[in-house]
Swiss-Prot record:
Function: Required for efficient passage of the G1/S transition.
Gene, per the UniProt record: cig1
Lineage of source species: Eukaryota, Fungi, Dikarya, Ascomycota, Taphrinomycotina
Source organism, top-level taxon: Eukaryota
GO MF, one annotated term: cyclin-dependent protein serine/threonine kinase activator activity
Similarity comment: family membership: Belongs to the cyclin family. Cyclin G subfamily.
Protein name (database record): G2/mitotic-specific cyclin cig1
Organism of this sequence: Schizosaccharomyces pombe (strain 972 / ATCC 24843) (Fission yeast)
GO CC annotation, single: cytoplasm
Protein backbone atom coordinates (compact mmCIF):
# COMPACT_ATOMS: atom_id res chain seq x y z
CA UNK A 1 0.00 0.00 0.00
CA UNK A 2 1.53 3.35 -1.04
CA UNK A 3 1.72 6.47 1.10
CA UNK A 4 -1.12 8.21 -0.69
CA UNK A 5 -3.45 5.29 0.03
CA UNK A 6 -2.50 5.35 3.71
CA UNK A 7 -3.22 9.07 3.82
CA UNK A 8 -6.64 8.58 2.24
CA UNK A 9 -7.29 5.76 4.71
CA UNK A 10 -6.55 8.03 7.65
CA UNK A 11 -8.97 10.72 6.51
CA UNK A 12 -11.96 8.47 7.15
CA UNK A 13 -12.18 9.39 10.81
CA UNK A 14 -10.79 12.88 10.32
CA UNK A 15 -12.65 15.41 8.19
CA UNK A 16 -10.68 17.68 5.90
CA UNK A 17 -12.64 20.83 6.64
CA UNK A 18 -12.34 22.53 10.00
CA UNK A 19 -15.54 22.79 12.00
CA UNK A 20 -17.07 26.24 12.24
CA UNK A 21 -17.33 27.08 15.93
CA UNK A 22 -20.27 29.44 15.44
CA UNK A 23 -22.58 26.61 14.34
CA UNK A 24 -25.50 25.55 16.52
CA UNK A 25 -27.03 22.12 15.95
CA UNK A 26 -30.77 21.97 16.69
CA UNK A 27 -32.73 18.78 17.20
CA UNK A 28 -36.50 18.57 16.92
CA UNK A 29 -38.22 16.41 19.54
CA UNK A 30 -34.84 15.27 20.78
CA UNK A 31 -33.61 14.47 24.28
CA UNK A 32 -30.06 15.22 23.21
CA UNK A 33 -29.28 18.90 23.62
CA UNK A 34 -26.48 20.11 21.41
CA UNK A 35 -25.28 23.51 22.52
CA UNK A 36 -23.03 26.06 20.87
CA UNK A 37 -19.54 25.16 19.84
CA UNK A 38 -18.37 21.90 18.35
CA UNK A 39 -20.91 19.12 18.79
CA UNK A 40 -21.51 16.08 16.63
CA UNK A 41 -24.78 15.95 14.67
CA UNK A 42 -26.31 13.13 16.71
CA UNK A 43 -29.60 11.70 15.49
CA UNK A 44 -31.98 11.18 18.38
CA UNK A 45 -33.80 7.87 18.53
CA UNK A 46 -37.05 9.73 19.14
CA UNK A 47 -36.80 11.06 15.60
CA UNK A 48 -36.50 7.82 13.66
CA UNK A 49 -40.19 7.64 12.80
CA UNK A 50 -40.54 11.37 12.21
CA UNK A 51 -40.43 13.12 8.86
CA UNK A 52 -38.91 16.28 10.32
CA UNK A 53 -35.20 16.55 9.69
CA UNK A 54 -32.83 18.29 12.09
CA UNK A 55 -31.33 21.45 10.70
CA UNK A 56 -27.97 23.10 10.92
CA UNK A 57 -28.38 26.77 11.71
CA UNK A 58 -25.58 28.98 10.49
CA UNK A 59 -26.25 32.62 11.28
CA UNK A 60 -29.66 33.39 9.77
CA UNK A 61 -29.52 30.71 7.09
CA UNK A 62 -30.71 27.12 7.46
CA UNK A 63 -29.32 24.18 5.57
CA UNK A 64 -29.91 20.44 5.84
CA UNK A 65 -27.34 18.23 7.49
CA UNK A 66 -25.78 15.92 4.91
CA UNK A 67 -23.29 13.08 5.06
CA UNK A 68 -20.00 14.30 6.38
CA UNK A 69 -18.02 12.34 3.80
CA UNK A 70 -19.69 13.70 0.70
CA UNK A 71 -19.56 11.94 -2.66
CA UNK A 72 -15.84 11.15 -2.58
CA UNK A 73 -16.06 8.38 0.01
CA UNK A 74 -14.58 5.66 -2.18
CA UNK A 75 -11.54 7.77 -3.04
CA UNK A 76 -11.06 8.99 0.53
CA UNK A 77 -11.10 5.60 2.24
CA UNK A 78 -8.92 2.55 1.86
CA UNK A 79 -8.00 -0.29 4.17
CA UNK A 80 -4.63 -1.30 5.48
CA UNK A 81 -3.88 -4.98 5.61
CA UNK A 82 -3.10 -6.89 8.77
CA UNK A 83 0.68 -6.61 8.37
CA UNK A 84 0.61 -2.84 8.04
CA UNK A 85 -1.61 -2.48 11.09
CA UNK A 86 0.82 -4.55 13.15
CA UNK A 87 3.73 -2.48 11.86
CA UNK A 88 2.01 0.65 13.09
CA UNK A 89 2.05 -0.81 16.64
CA UNK A 90 -1.56 0.03 17.33
CA UNK A 91 -1.20 -0.32 21.09
CA UNK A 92 1.36 2.47 21.27
CA UNK A 93 0.68 6.20 21.64
CA UNK A 94 -2.48 7.17 19.69
CA UNK A 95 -1.89 8.92 16.42
CA UNK A 96 -3.71 10.69 13.63
CA UNK A 97 -2.19 8.99 10.61
CA UNK A 98 -3.05 11.52 7.96
CA UNK A 99 -0.83 14.42 9.06
CA UNK A 100 2.32 14.99 7.00
CA UNK A 101 4.27 16.40 9.93
CA UNK A 102 3.15 13.72 12.38
CA UNK A 103 6.68 12.65 13.23
CA UNK A 104 7.60 16.19 14.22
CA UNK A 105 4.52 16.59 16.40
CA UNK A 106 4.22 13.08 17.83
CA UNK A 107 5.41 14.22 21.24
CA UNK A 108 2.32 16.37 21.61
CA UNK A 109 0.16 13.24 21.55
CA UNK A 110 1.82 11.64 24.55
CA UNK A 111 -0.60 10.97 27.40
CA UNK A 112 0.46 12.63 30.66
CA UNK A 113 1.83 10.44 33.40
CA UNK A 114 0.53 10.36 36.94
CA UNK A 115 -2.71 11.99 38.01
CA UNK A 116 -4.66 13.43 35.10
CA UNK A 117 -5.65 17.07 35.41
CA UNK A 118 -7.72 17.33 32.23
CA UNK A 119 -11.12 18.73 33.19
CA UNK A 120 -12.66 17.10 36.24
CA UNK A 121 -11.33 13.65 35.40
CA UNK A 122 -9.49 11.72 38.08
CA UNK A 123 -7.98 8.29 38.01
CA UNK A 124 -10.68 5.67 38.61
CA UNK A 125 -10.95 4.07 42.01
CA UNK A 126 -8.73 1.01 42.04
CA UNK A 127 -9.02 -1.30 45.06
CA UNK A 128 -6.13 -1.23 47.48
CA UNK A 129 -5.07 -4.50 49.02
CA UNK A 130 -3.92 -4.74 52.60
CA UNK A 131 -2.90 -7.79 54.62
CA UNK A 132 -6.29 -7.65 56.32
CA UNK A 133 -8.10 -7.76 52.96
CA UNK A 134 -6.09 -10.73 51.75
CA UNK A 135 -6.64 -12.52 55.06
CA UNK A 136 -10.39 -11.87 54.89
CA UNK A 137 -10.53 -13.24 51.34
CA UNK A 138 -8.62 -16.40 52.30
CA UNK A 139 -10.76 -16.89 55.39
CA UNK A 140 -13.98 -16.49 53.39
CA UNK A 141 -12.84 -19.06 50.83
CA UNK A 142 -11.82 -21.55 53.52
CA UNK A 143 -15.08 -21.13 55.43
CA UNK A 144 -17.26 -21.53 52.35
CA UNK A 145 -15.43 -24.60 51.11
CA UNK A 146 -15.42 -26.25 54.55
CA UNK A 147 -19.08 -25.66 55.39
CA UNK A 148 -21.07 -24.98 52.22
CA UNK A 149 -24.75 -24.25 52.73
CA UNK A 150 -27.40 -25.52 50.27
CA UNK A 151 -27.61 -21.99 48.82
CA UNK A 152 -23.87 -22.02 48.18
CA UNK A 153 -23.97 -25.20 46.12
CA UNK A 154 -24.48 -24.24 42.48
CA UNK A 155 -26.87 -26.67 40.76
CA UNK A 156 -27.26 -24.79 37.47
CA UNK A 157 -25.05 -26.59 34.91
CA UNK A 158 -24.89 -23.44 32.78
CA UNK A 159 -22.84 -21.79 35.54
CA UNK A 160 -20.18 -24.55 35.16
CA UNK A 161 -19.56 -24.84 38.94
CA UNK A 162 -16.64 -27.27 38.54
CA UNK A 163 -14.60 -24.62 36.72
CA UNK A 164 -16.02 -21.57 38.47
CA UNK A 165 -12.80 -20.35 40.17
CA UNK A 166 -10.73 -20.75 37.00
CA UNK A 167 -13.33 -18.92 34.89
CA UNK A 168 -13.54 -16.11 37.44
CA UNK A 169 -9.77 -15.60 37.50
CA UNK A 170 -9.61 -15.68 33.70
CA UNK A 171 -12.27 -12.98 33.44
CA UNK A 172 -10.30 -10.90 35.93
CA UNK A 173 -7.26 -11.14 33.68
CA UNK A 174 -9.35 -10.07 30.67
CA UNK A 175 -10.82 -7.07 32.47
CA UNK A 176 -7.33 -5.77 33.16
CA UNK A 177 -6.00 -6.54 29.69
CA UNK A 178 -8.90 -4.91 27.81
CA UNK A 179 -9.53 -1.90 30.05
CA UNK A 180 -9.08 1.48 28.30
CA UNK A 181 -6.55 3.94 29.73
CA UNK A 182 -8.30 6.43 32.02
CA UNK A 183 -6.60 9.49 30.53
CA UNK A 184 -7.08 8.74 26.83
CA UNK A 185 -9.05 11.92 26.07
CA UNK A 186 -5.86 13.96 26.36
CA UNK A 187 -4.82 12.70 22.91
CA UNK A 188 -8.01 13.84 21.19
CA UNK A 189 -8.14 17.18 19.41
CA UNK A 190 -11.81 17.85 18.62
CA UNK A 191 -13.74 15.83 21.19
CA UNK A 192 -13.81 15.93 24.98
CA UNK A 193 -15.51 14.23 27.93
CA UNK A 194 -18.72 16.17 27.25
CA UNK A 195 -18.81 14.72 23.74
CA UNK A 196 -18.32 11.22 25.13
CA UNK A 197 -21.10 11.80 27.67
CA UNK A 198 -23.49 12.75 24.86
CA UNK A 199 -22.42 9.79 22.75
CA UNK A 200 -22.97 7.24 25.55
CA UNK A 201 -26.35 8.80 26.35
CA UNK A 202 -27.32 8.36 22.69
CA UNK A 203 -26.05 4.75 22.72
CA UNK A 204 -28.31 4.06 25.70
CA UNK A 205 -31.27 5.48 23.76
CA UNK A 206 -30.51 3.14 20.86
CA UNK A 207 -30.20 0.23 23.30
CA UNK A 208 -33.62 1.03 24.72
CA UNK A 209 -35.12 1.36 21.24
CA UNK A 210 -33.87 -2.05 20.07
CA UNK A 211 -34.29 -3.66 23.52
CA UNK A 212 -30.69 -4.80 23.60
CA UNK A 213 -29.03 -6.67 26.46
CA UNK A 214 -27.06 -4.87 29.17
CA UNK A 215 -24.02 -6.88 28.05
CA UNK A 216 -24.33 -5.28 24.62
CA UNK A 217 -24.37 -1.78 26.07
CA UNK A 218 -21.31 -2.32 28.27
CA UNK A 219 -19.30 -3.95 25.49
CA UNK A 220 -20.17 -1.14 23.07
CA UNK A 221 -18.93 1.52 25.49
CA UNK A 222 -15.75 -0.48 26.14
CA UNK A 223 -15.07 -0.67 22.39
CA UNK A 224 -15.67 3.08 22.03
CA UNK A 225 -13.24 3.94 24.81
CA UNK A 226 -10.56 1.56 23.57
CA UNK A 227 -10.89 2.82 20.00
CA UNK A 228 -10.69 6.47 21.04
CA UNK A 229 -7.59 5.68 23.09
CA UNK A 230 -5.64 4.60 19.99
CA UNK A 231 -7.19 6.71 17.24
CA UNK A 232 -7.66 10.47 16.97
CA UNK A 233 -11.23 11.00 15.75
CA UNK A 234 -12.85 14.10 14.32
CA UNK A 235 -16.03 15.44 15.86
CA UNK A 236 -18.14 14.65 12.81
CA UNK A 237 -17.10 10.97 12.94
CA UNK A 238 -17.60 10.32 16.65
CA UNK A 239 -21.18 9.13 16.18
CA UNK A 240 -19.98 6.67 13.54
CA UNK A 241 -17.56 5.30 16.13
CA UNK A 242 -20.45 4.72 18.53
CA UNK A 243 -22.62 3.16 15.84
CA UNK A 244 -19.85 0.78 14.75
CA UNK A 245 -19.10 -0.25 18.33
CA UNK A 246 -22.77 -0.96 19.01
CA UNK A 247 -23.07 -3.00 15.82
CA UNK A 248 -20.07 -5.13 16.80
CA UNK A 249 -21.37 -5.58 20.34
CA UNK A 250 -24.78 -6.67 19.03
CA UNK A 251 -23.24 -9.36 16.86
CA UNK A 252 -21.17 -10.60 19.79
CA UNK A 253 -23.85 -10.59 22.50
CA UNK A 254 -27.32 -10.72 20.94
CA UNK A 255 -29.13 -13.83 19.70
CA UNK A 256 -31.06 -11.83 17.10
CA UNK A 257 -29.10 -8.61 16.57
CA UNK A 258 -30.64 -5.71 14.63
CA UNK A 259 -29.55 -5.55 11.02
CA UNK A 260 -27.17 -2.93 9.73
CA UNK A 261 -30.10 -1.40 7.87
CA UNK A 262 -31.82 -0.83 11.22
CA UNK A 263 -28.78 1.08 12.40
CA UNK A 264 -28.59 3.09 9.20
CA UNK A 265 -32.25 4.01 9.67
CA UNK A 266 -31.58 5.22 13.22
CA UNK A 267 -29.13 7.85 11.98
CA UNK A 268 -31.47 8.83 9.12
CA UNK A 269 -28.89 8.93 6.37
CA UNK A 270 -26.06 10.67 8.20
CA UNK A 271 -23.99 7.56 7.42
CA UNK A 272 -24.68 5.04 4.67
CA UNK A 273 -24.69 1.27 5.09
CA UNK A 274 -21.39 1.07 3.22
CA UNK A 275 -19.80 3.63 5.53
CA UNK A 276 -20.97 1.73 8.62
CA UNK A 277 -19.58 -1.56 7.28
CA UNK A 278 -16.22 0.00 6.51
CA UNK A 279 -16.07 1.67 9.93
CA UNK A 280 -16.96 -1.62 11.62
CA UNK A 281 -14.16 -3.45 9.83
CA UNK A 282 -11.69 -0.69 10.57
CA UNK A 283 -12.55 -0.70 14.27
CA UNK A 284 -12.13 -4.47 14.49
CA UNK A 285 -8.74 -4.34 12.77
CA UNK A 286 -7.53 -1.50 14.96
CA UNK A 287 -8.60 -3.41 18.10
CA UNK A 288 -6.94 -6.54 16.74
CA UNK A 289 -10.34 -8.30 16.80
CA UNK A 290 -10.03 -8.63 20.58
CA UNK A 291 -13.57 -8.02 21.82
CA UNK A 292 -13.74 -10.60 24.61
CA UNK A 293 -13.98 -8.03 27.42
CA UNK A 294 -16.09 -9.77 30.12
CA UNK A 295 -18.32 -6.88 31.25
CA UNK A 296 -19.88 -6.50 34.72
CA UNK A 297 -22.92 -8.76 34.30
CA UNK A 298 -20.98 -12.01 34.68
CA UNK A 299 -19.41 -10.73 37.90
CA UNK A 300 -22.78 -9.49 39.15
CA UNK A 301 -24.37 -12.90 38.59
CA UNK A 302 -21.62 -14.54 40.59
CA UNK A 303 -21.98 -12.13 43.51
CA UNK A 304 -25.76 -12.65 43.46
CA UNK A 305 -25.23 -16.24 44.59
CA UNK A 306 -24.50 -14.86 48.07
CA UNK A 307 -28.15 -13.75 48.34
CA UNK A 308 -29.78 -16.56 46.36
CA UNK A 309 -30.11 -14.24 43.36
CA UNK A 310 -32.27 -11.65 45.12
CA UNK A 311 -34.11 -9.84 42.32
CA UNK A 312 -34.44 -6.46 44.02
CA UNK A 313 -30.75 -6.21 44.85
CA UNK A 314 -29.75 -7.27 41.35
CA UNK A 315 -32.10 -4.81 39.64
CA UNK A 316 -30.79 -1.91 41.68
CA UNK A 317 -27.20 -3.03 41.14
CA UNK A 318 -27.74 -3.18 37.37
CA UNK A 319 -28.86 0.43 37.43
CA UNK A 320 -25.86 1.52 39.50
CA UNK A 321 -23.53 -0.29 37.11
CA UNK A 322 -24.93 1.56 34.12
CA UNK A 323 -24.60 4.89 35.94
CA UNK A 324 -20.83 4.41 35.90
CA UNK A 325 -20.85 4.35 32.09
CA UNK A 326 -21.68 8.05 31.97
CA UNK A 327 -18.87 9.39 34.13
CA UNK A 328 -15.27 9.41 32.94
CA UNK A 329 -13.99 8.89 36.48
CA UNK A 330 -14.80 5.16 36.15
CA UNK A 331 -12.92 4.65 32.87
CA UNK A 332 -10.15 2.12 33.39
CA UNK A 333 -11.55 0.79 36.66
CA UNK A 334 -11.69 -2.98 37.02
CA UNK A 335 -15.19 -3.95 35.97
CA UNK A 336 -15.38 -6.67 38.65
CA UNK A 337 -14.75 -3.92 41.19
CA UNK A 338 -17.56 -1.81 39.66
CA UNK A 339 -19.94 -4.79 39.81
CA UNK A 340 -19.04 -5.52 43.44
CA UNK A 341 -19.42 -1.85 44.42
CA UNK A 342 -22.81 -1.59 42.70
CA UNK A 343 -23.99 -4.71 44.52
CA UNK A 344 -22.63 -3.48 47.85
CA UNK A 345 -24.31 -0.08 47.49
CA UNK A 346 -27.62 -1.62 46.43
CA UNK A 347 -27.56 -3.77 49.56
CA UNK A 348 -26.98 -0.68 51.69
CA UNK A 349 -29.89 1.11 50.03
CA UNK A 350 -32.22 -1.83 50.65
CA UNK A 351 -31.23 -2.22 54.29
CA UNK A 352 -28.97 -5.26 53.94
CA UNK A 353 -26.02 -3.86 55.84
CA UNK A 354 -23.85 -6.96 56.32
CA UNK A 355 -21.16 -7.75 53.74
CA UNK A 356 -20.70 -11.37 54.76
CA UNK A 357 -17.79 -13.73 54.07
CA UNK A 358 -19.97 -15.20 51.35
CA UNK A 359 -20.11 -11.80 49.62
CA UNK A 360 -16.35 -11.42 50.05
CA UNK A 361 -15.72 -14.80 48.45
CA UNK A 362 -18.02 -14.37 45.44
CA UNK A 363 -17.06 -10.74 44.77
CA UNK A 364 -13.37 -10.97 45.59
CA UNK A 365 -13.46 -7.71 47.58
CA UNK A 366 -14.02 -6.61 51.17
CA UNK A 367 -16.41 -3.90 52.29
CA UNK A 368 -13.49 -1.65 53.21
CA UNK A 369 -12.32 -1.68 49.59
CA UNK A 370 -15.77 -0.95 48.17
CA UNK A 371 -16.81 2.02 50.31
CA UNK A 372 -14.75 4.76 48.52
CA UNK A 373 -16.09 3.77 45.11
CA UNK A 374 -19.64 3.54 46.51
CA UNK A 375 -19.37 7.15 47.66
CA UNK A 376 -18.38 8.24 44.14
CA UNK A 377 -21.42 6.45 42.68
CA UNK A 378 -23.61 8.19 45.24
CA UNK A 379 -22.26 11.53 44.05
CA UNK A 380 -23.40 10.64 40.53
CA UNK A 381 -26.93 10.03 41.85
CA UNK A 382 -27.38 13.46 43.45
CA UNK A 383 -28.35 15.02 40.11
CA UNK A 384 -29.35 11.75 38.46
CA UNK A 385 -31.87 13.10 35.87
CA UNK A 386 -29.16 15.32 34.38
CA UNK A 387 -26.09 13.18 35.01
CA UNK A 388 -27.50 10.15 33.16
CA UNK A 389 -30.83 11.15 31.66
CA UNK A 390 -31.45 8.18 29.36
CA UNK A 391 -30.44 5.62 31.99
CA UNK A 392 -32.52 7.38 34.64
CA UNK A 393 -35.62 7.31 32.42
CA UNK A 394 -34.96 3.70 31.47
CA UNK A 395 -34.90 2.53 35.09
CA UNK A 396 -37.83 4.74 36.12
CA UNK A 397 -40.26 2.44 34.31
CA UNK A 398 -42.49 0.07 36.26
CA UNK A 399 -40.90 -3.01 34.71
CA UNK A 400 -37.60 -1.83 36.19
CA UNK A 401 -39.31 -1.28 39.58
CA UNK A 402 -38.53 2.44 39.33
CA UNK A 403 -35.17 1.83 40.97
CA UNK A 404 -33.63 5.02 39.57
CA UNK A 405 -36.12 7.23 41.41
CA UNK A 406 -35.67 5.13 44.55
CA UNK A 407 -31.88 5.45 44.44
CA UNK A 408 -32.05 9.18 43.73
CA UNK A 409 -34.36 9.81 46.69
CA UNK A 410 -32.30 7.57 48.97
CA UNK A 411 -29.10 9.49 48.24
CA UNK A 412 -30.81 12.83 48.82
CA UNK A 413 -32.06 11.56 52.17
CA UNK A 414 -28.63 10.55 53.46
CA UNK A 415 -26.42 13.39 52.29
Amino acid sequence: MDVSTQTRHATYFQDENQLQKDHIYVKKKSHIKLNTGVRAPFKAVDNINQQDEPTLIEGNNESSISSSTGDTFEEDFAYQDKVEIEERSIRSTPKSIGDDDLENREGSFDAPEGILTHGKHRLPTIPEWTKEDLAALSEAAARLQANPSPEDIETDPSMVPDYDPEIFHYMQSLERKLAPPPNYMSVQQEIDWVTRHMLVDWIVQVQIHFRLLPETLFLAVNLIDRFLSIKVVSLQKVQLVGLSALLIACKYEEIHPPSIYNFAHVVQGIFTVDEIIRAERYMLMLLDFDISWPGPMSFLRRISRADSYDHDIRMLAKYLQEVTLMDEIFIGAHISFIAATAYYLSMQMLGHLDWTPCHVYYSGYTARQLKPCAIIIMECLVDAPNHHNAIYRKYSENRMKRVSAFAHNWVLSVI
